[in-house]
UniProtKB/Swiss-Prot annotation:
It comes from the Bacteria. Pathway: Carbohydrate degradation; 2-deoxy-D-ribose 1-phosphate degradation; D-glyceraldehyde 3-phosphate and acetaldehyde from 2-deoxy-alpha-D-ribose 1-phosphate: step 1/2. Its EC number is 5.4.2.7. This is Phosphopentomutase. It comes from Streptococcus pyogenes serotype M6 (strain ATCC BAA-946 / MGAS10394). CDD domains: PPM (cd16009). Its main location: cytoplasm. Pfam families: Metalloenzyme. Its cofactor is Mn(2+).
Length: 403
């Protein structure tokens, strides 16, 4: 019998809590990640008021230096710890896959200087369209269409760009390049990026509409991902008949593997929280696992090195946390964590190699305190033990610590 009938895992994308022990092996603009500290530096430079996460125990997580504006709680309502990544990567897919029980020993390839001519030329030859070379670099998805959409409308050239993650994205105005054509181009791009030196996690079709100065991305986005190389706990749950619900980009990250119910992409963190709450309210969701990713922290503020915006985004989530809890049942478990860091005060624009926080809450708790410090995959091991399925490759369950 399950200790908790439902477990809800919410990933606050990039909300790290201090440099990992191996941060010296990871870099931003030539600077090692050794001094990165997403929550610490936001708290220090912009101030941080997250009283609802404080109640659960966020300020009680062990740190060399306490979070400046996040107090400790004498009698928290939950259990907390921080977790270390063992996989050789600090990207979204690697973090999420490890959280679900896999050790990624060979990271995907990322292209901080843009894609090589060999890849671009192949796409041009296949599509019969030129590629705008100036867009070929890590770029905000909205900024890239603002900057190059007018040129695309005039020439029909492709907007090919990347990000901090191992992805190749192609943006196309739906009136200039039909969605079906864009999909075929992305399918081809997927076929040529399945092995090194260009092993990419996802190819993403990014259609948009509108006029210069007023472009809008449409719901016709399509992801061409690779599936995890081995079963994750999501697969073990699905195979055992335990429903799994994906909110946000979770379904894309796992290429649908082990997902029984995809609740759709998020338009924003707030929309994602709305979707999570609707998921919690589903009458048929009496037992199972929900997995939510809230990406605005990372996409809108971490990469853009905007600590004040990041702070406000954390405030927004914290303000809505009581709504999530109010829609949980007595025997539900809420786990709040991250997938990597992205210190908005740090050098460069890439993710940062950090510990991630873990907050555990249930209305059924009679105790509180610290969970032993462990690794990302401890989450998957805990979920697996709760539902009585086999664990994946790695991880130690902390289920027994939750009283």
């Amino acid at each position: 019998m399950s200790k908790f009938n439902r477990i809800h895992l919410v990933v606050l994308d990039s909300v790290g809590i201090g440099a990992a022990p191996d941060a010296d092996k990871f870099f931003n603009a030539g600077v090692a990640d050794t001094d990165s500290d997403t929550l610490g530096h936001i708290s220090e430079t912009a101030g941080l008021s997250v009283p609802n996460m404080v109640k659960i125990g966020l300020g009680n997580i062990s740190r060399p230096i306490p979070l400046k504006t996040v107090p400790t709680e004498d009698n928290p309502t939950g259990y907390v710890t921080k977790l270390e990544e063992v996989s050789l990567g600090k990207d979204t897919m690697t973090g999420h896959w490890e959280i679900m029980g896999l050790n990624i020993t060979e990271p995907f390839d990322t292209f901080w200087n843009g894609f090589p001519e060999e890849i671009l030329t192949k796409i041009e030859e296949f599509s019969g369209r030129k590629i705008i070379r100036e867009a070929n670099k890590p770029y905000s998805g909205t900024a890239v269409i603002d900057d190059f959409g007018p040129h695309q409308m005039e020439t029909g050239e492709l907007i090919v760009y990347t990000s901090a993650d191992p992805v190749l994205q192609i943006a196309a105005h739906e009136d200039i390049i039909l969605v079906e054509e864009l999909y075929k181009i992305c399918e081809y791009a997927r076929s040529i990026t399945l092995e090194r030196p260009a092993l990419l996690g996802r190819i993403i079709a990014r259609p948009y509409v509108g006029e210069p100065g007023n472009f809008t991305r449409t719901a016709n986005r399509h992801d061409y991902a690779v599936s995890p190389f081995q079963d994750t706990v999501l697969n073990k749950l699905a195979d055992a008949g335990v429903p799994t619900y994906a909110v946000g980009k979770i379904n894309d990250i796992f290429n649908g593997s082990g997902i029984t119910n995809d609740m759709g992409h998020n338009k924003s963190n707030s929309h994602g929280i709305d979707t999570l709450i609707k998921t919690l309210q589903l009458p048929e969701f009496t037992k199972g696992f929900s997995f939510t990713n809230l990406v605005d922290f990372d996409a809108n503020f971490g990469h853009r090195r905007d600590p004040e915006g990041y702070r406000d985004c954390l405030h927004e989530f914290d303000n809505r946390l009581p709504e999530i809890i109010a829609n949980m049942k007595e025997d539900d478990l809420l786990l709040i964590t991250a997938d990597h860091g992205n210190d908005p005060t740090y050098a460069g624009t890439d993710h940062t190699r950090e510990y991630i926080p873990l907050l555990a809450y249930s209305a059924s708790f009679t105790g509180n305190g610290l969970i032993p410090q462990g690794h990302f995959a401890d989450i998957s091991a805990t979920v697996a033990e709760n539902f009585g399925v086999d664990t994946a490759m790695i991880g130690e369950s902390f289920l027994g610590h939750l009283k």
